[in-house]
Amino acid sequence: PAQFLEQFTMPFALENTLKYYASVEDFKADLVKMYKAFIEEIYAAGCRNLQLDDCSWGLLVDPRGPEFFNTDQAGLDAIKQEYLDINNAVLTDLPEDLIVNTHVCRGNFHSTYAASGAYDDVASFLFEKENVHAYFLEFDDSRSGGFESLKYVSGDKKVVLGLITTKSGELEDKEAVIARIHEAAKYVLLDRLYLSPQCGFASCEIENKLTEEQQWAKLKLVKEIAEEVWG
């Protein structure tokens, strides 16, 4: 929901959105209704595990955030709260057996990206207060920052560490990945940590710059590491 809101209310889009809505609040009310109706529909069809891909937080942590949103730091903090509120408004009163996860992405088009930045500036909003069961997080390079922000992950929420990049065919060093998992475990208990690729291998029509064989080698590595770390 936050990414939908972002795309229709960022400076380049807001004027056009307000041609159809009297206010942003009216737009947000419709947005919540739409998402709730969709979730109800797919739940009735059998969905019990819902993942929300959310690039909005990636733009907020980027050093160019004030430029993207045409605001200052106080304005960015207000936007973080707004995005948290819209997500949680959608994620209230859901069926107890529906698992909701979120993937925070910084862009994954043809082995390029849209944003950079550690999670620190959004952690107290996203990790502490968003009503999801698990976070799928990119941690495949220095653009993602360190693991310190994971200390904000509240309750028994799970964290899926995206330590295996999908942007390059180069295979990661197994022992280095295992070491990073144990580093993350300083902030979130190991039994609440998981491992995955950083994002999709073909998030868009134009796939990333690696071969199918390299893709499968990376997935095999994920499996091997998971078996070694968690048994």
Tell me what each language-model feature is:
Residues 1-231:
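Domain-level signal for soluble alpha/beta catalytic cores
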